[in-house]
Amino acid sequence: MSEKLYQIISKVFNVDDSKINDETSPENLEEWDSFNFYVLLDEIENEFNMKFDLNETLEIKKIGDFKKIFQKHRINE
């Protein structure tokens, strides 16, 4: 799951995946802006065949938060 997630993030933010970890956030990744965040949400929803609800999107402050949401949705890929 992490590898696939990191590949999507790398593609959306146009950064090397070596710059991405669970602590990656808008504070330490310049490319993470509001537009790219919504592109990222869409890409993840399509790749993992899921939908984020509004509260989930508001909870996401760093990459590790996606994994918590995946657990809630029982996504283990």
Please describe what each predicted stretch is.
Residues 1-41, 46-77:
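Phosphopantetheine-dependent thiolation modules in NRPS/PKS and related acyl-activating systems
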